[in-house]
Amino acid sequence: MGVIFFCAIFLRVYRLAQIPDILQLDEAGLSYNAWCLVHYGTDRYLNIHPFYAQNFEGGQSPLYTYLLVLLIKTLGQGNISLWLTRLPAVLASILLFLTGVKTISCIFHDRKFHIAAACFLAFCPYYIMSGRLALDCNLMLCCSAVSLLLLLKYIQTDKLRFLILCGISFGFTMYSYALSYFIVPIFLVLVTLYMLYTHKITFPKAVLFAIIVCVTATPVILLHVHCYSNGNPFIFWVSLFLRLLPSVCLI
């Protein structure tokens, strides 16, 4: 297992700034926005400390942007490089590897499954490339995997600390990519109803879980209240219901 883990790291860090040998458009926008935030406190469109730094024809998720800001201030000492820009993707990919293997080990006790999962996560081209490109969407996969592992640990152990950590993790997932605004709430509603039905969670714990997720994701919620309703919460919730209704009907 150690050899597989070493190979996984090597495939993600070897010549990181040269392979791929192109600067992807979103990477360029992300790195320049982060650099501007470090030095001027604005994105490149002069928005002061934005929740969403503006990129070409839209915004970029805050988690990757502000992780990169932190790295530029610390490791980069104010300077930006392609290697530094891609470092959060590498760290997320390695964490995904560890989380995925741990999740499989919690479900299957046969070591062959653990090795198979490790090989798949280490050598699958998609997982390799997701760790070598600075795309904000790639962080959602890692955050979701961590959240699911913590949810699984709670179901298996019924320990409150795992439920709290799971709620925090799902809340942070909302900062990773815009698609999570639809997927995470629908998933959490369905899985909570299922756990209530199967007595895996009590109603007070379910309420606590929902509160933790909402508190952690409060900036995201406030942003969308402002964007979709001009500050009117009633209009926001009605518009959100209408947006989610087709997805719920399909489920």
Description of each model-found segment:
Residues 1-14, 95, 105, 115, ...:
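Start-transfer (signal-anchor) and selected internal transmembrane alpha helices
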Residues 4, 100-123:
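Transmembrane-helix signature of polytopic, membrane-embedded enzymes
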Residues 8-11, 117-122, 170, 174:
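Short helix- or helix-capping micro-motifs
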Residues 13-16, 28-58, 63-66, 70-74:
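Extracytosolic helix-loop segments that constitute the early lumenal/periplasmic catalytic or substrate-binding loops
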Residues 30-40, 172-175, 181-251:
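Transmembrane-lumen/periplasm boundary regions of multi-pass, lipid-linked membrane glycan transferases
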Residues 83-109, 146, 150:
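Transmembrane-helix motifs of polytopic, lipid-linked glycan transferases
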Residues 85, 89, 126-137, 179:
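Short acidic/glycine- and proline-prone juxtamembrane loop motifs at membrane-interface regions
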Residues 105-111, 145-163, 173, 198:
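Membrane-interface transmembrane helices that cradle and orient dolichyl/undecaprenyl
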